[in-house]
From Swiss-Prot:
Xref: CDD domains: HP_HAP_like
Topology of this chain in the membrane: Single-pass membrane protein
Family, similarity comment: Belongs to the histidine acid phosphatase family.
Membrane-spanning segments: 382-402
Enzyme Commission designation: 3.1.3.2
UniProtKB keywords: Disulfide bond, Glycoprotein, Hydrolase, Lysosome, Membrane, Signal, Transmembrane, Transmembrane helix
Gene Ontology, cellular component aspect: lysosomal lumen; lysosomal membrane; lysosome
InterPro entries referenced in this protein's UniProt entry, alphabetically: Acid_Pase_AS, His_Pase_clade-2, His_PPase_superfam, Histidine_acid_phosphatase
Primary localization: membrane
Lumenal topological intervals: 31-381
Catalytic residues (positions): H42 (nucleophile), D287 (proton donor)
Ranges of the Cytoplasmic topological domain: 403-423
Protein name according to UniProt: Lysosomal acid phosphatase
Length: 423
């Protein structure tokens, strides 16, 4: 009996202590999503330009060149629906302006893509319907003029240092060899299109035109065989690498994609230290925007981002209170977003590690880093000369003032103090 009583007392004591611990210790918080940033490309569009011998000129396209098509609108509406499903329980099912902020480049196709996306993401509820026959509500999309956009329109410029890096890239063996290997092919394309300047850097225009025409069921010219179009596609992908890589990728990133990445990291850090809105920040932009960002992150797959593709940043608060970042890339509407792994970090990357690993591509002063070394030195010399000139000018003014006052004193007797005056 005594042994049983002792065992019972120990069990009761353990239960009592466990109850006390649960009372004193705060409950463990489950891992939770705190903030999402999206960067997506616009949807299907008409060609941005064409070539002189193209039988399909601008009047062939209902809204002209570079405009979002009905297919593009549907692509983004479907992406909005997919995002609505992915973030069910995180975002409100109806639009709340405090939760969402959308910024777009100032192009019709990106603005309209954002609007179509929001229509899929936030269909109006009963209270938000302004017309019972219209299942849509206006949601603001913010932008700045193209000439002032230093966040989403790439490549950023003017930037003399970046142009210098591009000139150096043209001298690399990879670029030179690619030019030699494709010289005859580029000449053929120039002859068939009527273009006078077809290079590795401009060939994407030809591919883009043919791709858009083929996508919309237009008959391609005989010279644009499947093999030719495939080769054009490969050179188009090379032109993206030329913009942001091949040579001095980190330096290029500091002047290009690192600018956007810096803003994204700033937002992630802010959301980890405050509980402010919004929950969702959206950027509507271009394939070059996605390439610039992904090259800065060193996660680019070497292929042009398809229409309505979407790079996702998700900020989580772990059960221990720390924060982590996960990235995904949705480049196929029929598949789940593909996990992206920042080199040197697991997919669930601690926020502090994410910041540390990306620091080399974050510019400290973009304007200053864009200047050439000689320009910086010349500026310093000019400033020094300006300072010296100002000092010399002040000395001359002071000297002239003294001389003027001396000459202004009237002639006659002047008292001269002797020693007794200072006794």
């Amino acid at each position: 009996m005594a042994g049983r009583q002792t065992g019972w007392s120990q069990a009761a004591l353990l239960q009592f202590l466990l109850g006390m611990c649960l009372t004193v210790m705060p409950p463990i918080q489950a891992r939770s999503l705190r903030f999402v940033t999206l960067l997506y490309r616009h949807g299907d569009r008409s060609p941005v330009k064409t070539y002189p011998k193209d039988p399909y000129q601008e009047e062939k396209w209902p809204q002209g060149f570079g405009q979002l098509t009905k297919e593009g609108m549907l692509q983004h509406w479907e992406l909005g629906q997919a995002l609505r499903q992915r973030y069910h329980g995180f975002l409100n099912t109806s639009y709340h302006r405090q939760e969402v902020y959308v910024r777009s480049t100032d192009f019709d196709r990106t603005l309209m893509s954002a609007e179509a996306n929001l229509a899929g993401l936030f269909p109006p509820n009963e209270v938000q319907h302004f017309n019972p026959n219209i299942s849509w509500q206006p949601i603001p999309v913010h932008t700045v003029p193209i000439t002032e956009d230093r966040l989403l329109k790439f490549p950023l410029g003017p930037c003399p240092r970046y142009e210098q890096l591009q000139n150096e890239t043209r001298q690399t063996p990879e670029y030179q060899n690619r030019s030699i290997q494709n010289a005859q092919f580029l000449n053929m394309v120039a002859n068939e299109t009527g273009l006078t300047n077809v290079t590795l850097e401009t060939i994407w225009n030809v591919y883009d035109t043919l791709f858009c025409e083929q996508t919309h069921g237009l008959l391609l010219p005989p010279w644009a065989s499947p093999q030719t179009v495939q080769r054009l596609s490969q050179l188009k992908d090379f032109s993206f690498l030329f913009l942001f890589g091949i040579h001095e990728q980190v330096q290029k990133a500091r002047l290009q994609g690192g600018v956007l990445l810096a803003q994204i990291l700033k937002n992630l850090t802010l959301m980890a230290t405050t509980s402010q809105f919004p929950k969702l920040l959206v950027y509507s932009a271009h394939d070059t925007t996605l390439v610039a960002l992904q090259m800065a992150l060193n996660v680019y797959n070497g292929k042009q981002a398809p229409y309505a593709s979407c790079h996702i940043f998700e900020l989580y608060q772990e059960d221990n209170g720390n924060f982590s970042v996960e990235m995904y890339f949705r480049n196929d509407s029929k598949k789940a977003p593909w996990p992206l792994i920042l080199p040197g970090c697991p997919h669930r990357c601690p926020l502090q590690d994410f910041l540390r690993l990306t620091e080399p591509v974050i510019p400290k002063d973009w304007q200053k880093e864009c200047q050439l070394a000689n320009d910086t030195a010349d500026t310093e010399v000019i400033v020094a000369l300006a300072v010296c000139g100002s000092i010399l000018f002040l000395l001359i003014v002071l000297l002239l003032t003294i001389l003027f006052r001396m000459q202004a004193q009237p002639p006659g007797y002047h008292h001269v103090a002797d020693r007794e005056d200072h006794a």
